[in-house]
Amino acid sequence: MMVIVLDNSNIRVVVGMSGGVDSSVTALLLKQQGYDVVGVFMKNWDDTDENGVCTATTDYEDVAKVASEIGIPYYSINFEKEYWDRVFQYFLDEYKAGRTPNPDVMCNKEIKFKAFLDYADQLNADYIAMGHYAQVKTDENGIVHMLRGADGNKDQTYFLSQLSQDQLKKSLFPIGHLQKPEVRKIAEAAGLATAKKKDSTGICFIGERNFKQFLSTYLPAQPGKMMTVDGVEMGTHDGLMYYTIGQRQGLGIGGNSDNSEPWFVVGKDLDKNILYVGQGFDNPALMATSLSASNLNWTTGQAPAEGTHMTAKFRYRQRDTGVTLHYHDDGTATVDFDVPVRAITPGQAVVFYDGDECLGGGTIDAAYAHTNELQYV
């Protein structure tokens, strides 16, 4: 049997390396597959943490170690201005509007797969790659389809739902077929410096910090009344921007003798600066039967037909829900749910799937219960 060995040495892949294990193994696998690999560390935030430690310095040192271990050149690029203009300003504007944004979706669209891709082009890249858990396949017509990562717990297609065909055609996802424990084993077997480094969490590039304190640095808080939907005053809130639909923690309200169920955020009135709360995880005020969405993007460049039935996620790591899509002339859409869904949150992403394929997504503008708009913003 003849074995065909592909020569990838003339194909340059610029890898966005964060200093974490996923992007480290991405670079390693591409190098092992014979590609011309270049590592690039992105600095997108002036990120001195709460202890005064610049985490970017530590991460860059890890990138340098891994690049040396793999045997690839590496560079650093500063996208702080682009991040501020394209992601963080949007993040603040959404909170000002009483919504709960998803900066990771915007960060992928505008920074990791746009600003970074433009920079990679200057390095004569044929492709870019990062450490995302997603997969792609190209059909006979040259259309790239994005599929869920094999590790269902790590799948990141939700955050990649705003990518275009042009972006996907230039992207490789070398760890998308792997489970997270396999990625760590590969790193350990290769002796990579990041093999045991813990995963980063928190806002894209901003990381883990006291969110309330962080947000108050940029937006002045406006305390106001906390009320039930029936108009009973329950106390005061610290500022609507600090609360999200369905939130339980931080309300400072206990049960009463008649009802011991916990309290949840069930709505916001931005004009009156009122935070609405209600008792019970499945409080009727939290249950929606449809939503409206804007900023729709379809990853293949082709929108599904009117009335198409598919599945959708409304939060990361949420189970899929069956939905039906209906378009409007203004470019928005109504998404009807097969079953009621709890805590649909304006500002978050709604992401659509056909089996394992991520079809695209949009931004949730409003939630409805049997055509009545819920008081969410």
Swiss-Prot record:
Keywords: ATP-binding, Cytoplasm, Disulfide bond, Nucleotide-binding, RNA-binding, Transferase, tRNA processing, tRNA-binding
Listed transmembrane segments: none
InterPro entries, A to Z: MnmA-like, MnmA-like_C, MnmA-like_central, MnmA-like_central_sf, Rossmann-like_a/b/a_fold
Protein family: Belongs to the MnmA/TRMU family.
Interaction with tRNA, annotated site positions: 132, 348
Record GO cellular component, one term: cytoplasm
CDD domains on file: MnmA_TRMU-like (cd01998)
Species: Lacticaseibacillus paracasei (strain ATCC 334 / BCRC 17002 / CCUG 31169 / CIP 107868 / KCTC 3260 / NRRL B-441) (Lactobacillus paracasei)
Protein name in the entry: tRNA-specific 2-thiouridylase MnmA
Record-listed ATP binding positions: 16-23, 42, 131
GO biological process: tRNA wobble position uridine thiolation
Tagged with keyword Cytoplasm: yes
Location in the cell: Cytoplasm
GO function terms (MF aspect): ATP binding; tRNA binding; tRNA-uridine 2-sulfurtransferase activity
Active site: 107, 204
Region (Interaction with tRNA): 154-156, 315-316
UniProt function note: Catalyzes the 2-thiolation of uridine at the wobble position (U34) of tRNA, leading to the formation of s(2)U34.
Cystine residue pairs: 107-204
Catalytic activity: S-sulfanyl-L-cysteinyl-[protein] + uridine(34) in tRNA + AH2 + ATP = 2-thiouridine(34) in tRNA + L-cysteinyl-[protein] + A + AMP + diphosphate + H(+)
Region (Interaction with target base in tRNA): 102-104
EC number: 2.8.1.13
